[in-house]
Curated annotation (Swiss-Prot):
GO terms for molecular function: microtubule binding. GO terms for cellular component: cytoplasm; cytoplasmic microtubule; cytoplasmic microtubule plus-end; microtubule cytoskeleton; mitotic spindle midzone. Residues 410-446, 467-562, 573-592 are annotated as: Disordered. The keyword RNA-binding does not apply. This is Meiotic coiled-coil protein 1. Residues 414-430 have a biased composition (Low complexity). PANTHER family: FASCETTO-RELATED (PTHR19321:SF41), PROTEIN REGULATOR OF CYTOKINESIS 1 PRC1-RELATED (PTHR19321). The keyword Coiled coil applies. The lineage of its organism: Eukaryota, Fungi, Dikarya, Ascomycota, Taphrinomycotina. It comes from Schizosaccharomyces pombe (strain 972 / ATCC 24843). Keywords: Coiled coil, Meiosis. Residues 472-481, 548-562, 582-592 have a biased composition (Polar residues). InterPro entries: MAP65_Ase1_PRC1 (IPR007145).
């Protein structure tokens, strides 16, 4: 139908064109008509072909560009393309315009972020990540890349903000430090790089160290001044810590040191003397003594040292007050101990007179009696105060529990084996050897109890006299071996006479003479070893013997001359004087001549032979000899007991009062 219409129209076109050609004189045939149709169709075809080529080229360009944009944008989804070329072209144009707009937006965003990253990186001194560009455009502006750039930018912003705050904080601190140190320097430029912040921190630490050093020095100066004056010093110096202020503080301290140097020196020397005096009185060993250095040897004498000295002195004064009279008794004990050793050494190197062994014997008895009394007093004191007394760094109780070894000890190997040879009761004592050796005498401890207590004066001796450190050998006696062995056993047990009472109590003795009062005797169970040779040089500096207070004695009950010596002494062993009661004077004062005779007789009599086994005939003979001096039985009893106590009477009337040797 359509072809028929086209054929009709072509016939009409042919007829019309033929008519017109005839009018014009042109020849027009069907061939011409066909050529015209073909030429028109050919031209139209060429136009279409050109158009198609153009459209295809455009489509290709669009496709390639779209593909590149999709790649840069990271788009992987496929698009639907129409079949016709014109539709394809239009679709590509539309899609290209859309994707190009997206690309341009992301490109601008990426460029802005990258520029900011570059700027912050330069400020912070950080490295910039390389970004690939193609003809000025980003090669990759996908969402992932944009997220990375955004994260990097946020990180740099955070670092920048922190460093900015740190920089401001450091500069504020620097300003304060500079003001405190009176330093006027221009602040460094803002440099937020790591090195810049590091330099600021180093500079700040230097200023802070300088400030702390100066502040600590000022504090030391203030504390030292406070220790000197005892209160916070008031000063009008500036409150900053500049070099000038520090110099002013140093000058202030130097001037105050000069003022307090004399004060501290005087106070230190006074307190040092007081402390050393108390330390010697309290028997503190030299190793344990404090504050022994001279003032010039101490690098820094301050108020704290003075206070510590006062505290130590206060402690010693409290201890001295608590010990009371016990301290004097301890001193007498140590000094008498040194005198015993000195006398024993003197007798060992000298050929002394007949009175020398007797003097040493009296000293030894004094020592044992004083030691026994000191043990009793020390035990009571320790129980009351619940603490121990230390002498030269060691407990006094352990020192007293050591038995004193007499300076003259009989050599048992040289004792005569003549057991039956005994002197007659009326005969004089055997002769003593004096050819370079010590006489054969035994110093024994006597446990005697008296009715009356006595007051003991202080006896002083040189602190350089050493203690007994060993047993001193002596020449053998001419008496029997059996008696000598018995005497040795009695000596080692600590008493001259055996104590028949079962109690081991320690009692003070009652009688005395001008040679001093007698102290309680140490019972055999009180100690077990010899006194060590230690600490004697720790005693007070050398002092001379001085006169002492005298003590009055009471008269004892009369005893018949026929009674044995043991029976005369026995009442003394069972009586204890009332506490705090002092003895009275003698009832019957013998004549001076009789006293002298009795003294010489008692000194020459060998009292070492007296024991519980002594015969009654010997005792009676001695009493008869004493009776020959026209003395009463009461006087004889007194003389015997006084001499057994280690005392004797002098020839003058004032000798009725006991004094130390």
């Amino acid at each position: 139908m359509e072809l028929a219409k086209i054929g009709d129209r072509l016939n009409n076109y042919y007829n019309n064109i033929y008519t017109l050609s005839e009018k014009l004189g042109y020849s027009f045939t069907k061939i011409s008509f066909n050529n015209i149709i073909l030429d028109a169709l050919s031209g139209h075809q060429r136009k279409l072909e050109i158009k198609i080529i153009n459209i295809e080229s455009k489509c290709n360009e669009l496709s390639s560009e779209i593909s590149l944009l999709r790649k840069r944008l990271g788009i992987i989804e496929e698009i639907e393309i129409p079949r016709t070329l014109i539709d394809q072209y239009e679709c590509l144009v539309t899609y290209h315009n859309g994707i190009r707009a997206i690309y341009n937006t992301k490109k601008n965003e990426a460029k802005n972020m990258y520029k900011e990253i570059e700027r912050l990186s330069v400020i912070l001194g950080e490295s910039v990540d390389e970004v690939n560009f193609v003809n000025g455009d980003f090669e990759d502006i996908s969402d992932i890349k944009l997220e990375q750039l955004s994260a990097k930018l946020n990180e740099l912003h955070q670092i920048y903000r922190l460093r900015k705050e740190k920089n401001i904080e450091i500069k504020e601190e620097l300003k304060k430090l500079q003001d405190s140190l009176s330093i006027k320097l221009s602040m460094p430029a803002d440099d937020l790089s790591k090195n810049g912040i590091k330099h600021l921190i180093i500079y700040k630490e230097k200023l802070r160290f300088s400030l702390e050093s100066r502040k600590s020095r000022v504090d030391e100066i203030v504390n030292e001044m406070k220790n000197m004056c005892g209160k916070n010093p008031t000063s009008e110096l500036p409150t900053n810590y500049s070099d000038k202020t520090l110099t002013l503080w140093e000058n202030e301290l130097s001037s105050m040191r000069k003022v307090y140097f004399v004060k501290y020196k005087t106070e230190y020397e006074f307190l040092q003397k007081r402390y050393l005096s108390l330390a010697r009185i309290m028997f503190v060993s030299k190793k344990e003594m404090l504050f022994t250095s001279q003032f010039k040897e101490i690098p820094n004498v301050n108020r704290e040292l003075i206070q510590s000295m006062k505290q130590e002195i206060g402690n010693l004064e409290v201890d001295l007050h608590l010990q009371g009279e016990l301290n004097n008794m301890i001193r007498r004990y140590l000094l008498l101990e040194s005198r015993v050793y000195k006398e024993s050494q003197r007798m060992k190197v000298l050929s002394g007179s007949a009175s020398q062994p007797f003097t040493l014997k009296r000293l030894q008895k004094d020592f044992q009696l004083l030691k026994a009394k000191l043990i009793c007093a020390l035990r009571e004191w320790e129980e009351d105060n619940e603490k121990k007394i230390y002498v030269f760094g060691k407990p006094l109780s352990s020192r007293l529990l050591m038995i004193h070894s007499p300076p003259i000890l009989q050599n048992q190997e040289n004792i005569s084996s003549n057991d039956n040879s005994k002197s007659s009761p009326e005969s004089s004592p055997p002769a003593r050897k004096t050819t370079g050796k010590i006489e054969n005498k035994k110093l024994r401890n006597i446990d005697v109890q008296s009715k009356k207590s006595i007051r003991f004066p202080l006896r002083l001796a040189s602190h350089e006299e050493p203690l007994i450190d060993r047993m001193v050998n002596q020449s053998p006696d001419t008496r029997s071996v059996s008696k000598s062995k018995r005497l040795v056993r009695e000596t080692s047990s600590g008493c001259l006479f055996k104590n028949h009472s079962k109690s081991n109590t320690l009692s003070p003795r009652r009688k005395g003479s001008r040679h001093g009062p007698r102290e309680p005797c140490l019972s055999p169970d009180a100690s077990s070893s010899s006194i060590p040779v230690t600490d004697i040089k720790e005693i007070l500096p050398s002092q001379h013997d001085t006169p002492h207070n005298s003590v009055k004695l009471t008269g004892s009950s009369t005893t018949p001359a026929s009674v044995s010596l043991r029976q005369m002494i026995e009442p003394l062993l069972s009586r204890t004087p009332p506490k705090g009661e002092f003895t009275n004077s003698l009832d019957d004062t013998p004549t001076q001549s009789n006293v002298e005779k009795v003294d010489r007789f008692l000194e020459n009599h060998d009292w070492e032979t007296c024991s519980e086994s002594s015969s009654a005939s010997e005792d009676q003979s001695l009493c008869k000899q004493l009776s020959s001096f026209s003395l009463s039985s009461s006087d004889i009893s007194k003389k015997l007991k006084n001499n057994l106590n280690g005392l004797h009477f002098s020839s003058d009337e004032g000798s009725k009062l006991p004094t130390f040797l």
